[in-house]
Amino acid sequence: MVKEIYGTKVGMTQIFDEKGVAIPVTAIEVKPLTVVAKKTADKDGYNAIVVSFGEIKEKNANKPHKGIFAKAGVDVQKYLREIKVENVDEYEIGSKITVDTFTTEDSVDVQGTSKGKGFQGVIKRHGQHRGPMGHGSMYHRRPGSMGSKTSTILNLNVVKVDADKNVILVKGSIPGAKKSIVRVRKSVK
């Protein structure tokens, strides 16, 4: 059984529960993942499946990338990711993994790349006050690049799973800009 999938962040909205209370949710679009290869404990030291997703023109893919898809006999896609599984025999090469992996009772962890802020000063980057400037102050952190780091939000509730539109709605916000790739996995804690 797969415990994680990959999708793209669509954006935030709100839905209303039975009592009329607004719930802020983030929509994640999960196109079906295609199983491209299997990794076994005998050959590779661990059990995993290699999945692909995302559209790309075949002429824009590099030769090693094309070779993986030619060996599997499936159409070329943009991204390749590994998902650890307990039993690789449950999956056939070319089969699809859909959004039905999750239900509304699940709690998930969402991992993505935070929005990049560029070069920022210490007040914005570290939340410092100006403090004493001279006379040998030794605690000043330095300005520098902020954001564009991998970030994980733990224990978000799945509010709705729409298999027809390939969308998961999770309660709250998740890291990243719109159209960024996110990893959704069942909570580990």
Model-assigned labels for residue ranges:
Residues 1-189:
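Extended basic (Lys/Arg/His-rich) segments that typically form rRNA-contacting surfaces
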